[in-house]
């Protein structure tokens, strides 16, 4: 059984649409909605669908006690890689990432807008999204592939001697810098067949719109999903929040800053677990929950905690339909004309929730390598 934590920037929820009065006027003005075209709005829904699917698969495959992922980070890193795919490999990636019905230009423009707009919509919240592309010295990458990652993903591109011991340190130092040192290391070594790393890093620091007072934090029991009671530092406040409940759970939306970003908490009831709810939760159901939230005074008890995770996402992504990309039959001919495949997708995360707010980070690494060289049979006629 798992105590499940989700920190995913779900784009449909980044701007509050609730205009009801809050308990104090000494608050930042609400964020202005991001202007999206119909196609970009459609892509938002697709990306959120990918987020829910990925989260469910990670829960199924992970043995971690706590599960905390950033689907946005995974989506961006795979979006960079998708530009190098071709044929059936590309089609499978589009299906897993839920990109159907959109052109290459529309998809890349969507990622560009995310990365240029999200960090600016709340001046009280720090959000950075950074991308990089590292390739082995002497590896001849097609210029179109490099250019699309520079133009749309603002990727830092560097040729690196992967055979040197300091190559790992160089990549890890970039990740550490882009996550405010919350994720200091993502790679232990670079395999001999690795030729490229496509990396996304996200850092988030948000201050609660309604902060908890430290004097109200006390030791209290917390019952995990195994039914065990453990002592935690339980924060408390009474204020006005967007809230709803049904026969399955209670729902609470706790905004940061100007409400551009928020943490929506699901508290199961009537014998349900978080895993039970998430197993069947769809984007449409999630949107319905958000629309049913209404402002009311709530007494909030919330644990202060921190958590970090490391995941290998190969199996979850394969189970989502991205099969060929991880095999010798993969087609990444838009990177080079040689035979390449995705050898690993690594995902590291960190989150800390305190009385003041939330600090979190995520790094997704897509490792691309040469496929195994096929054994050529020898037929030597040197005897009758």
Name each region found by the language model.
Residues 104-270, 291-376:
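Non-catalytic, conformational "gating/processing" segments within enzyme and secreted inhibitor domains
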Residues 377-383:
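Short loop/turn motifs at secondary-structure junctions and domain boundaries
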Residues 60-61, 247-249, 283-286:
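Short amphipathic beta-strand starts and helix->beta connectors
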Residues 2-7, 14-162:
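Detector for small/aliphatic-rich hydrophobic stretches
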Residues 4-5, 27, 339, 347, ...:
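Non-catalytic interaction/Regulatory regions outside core domains
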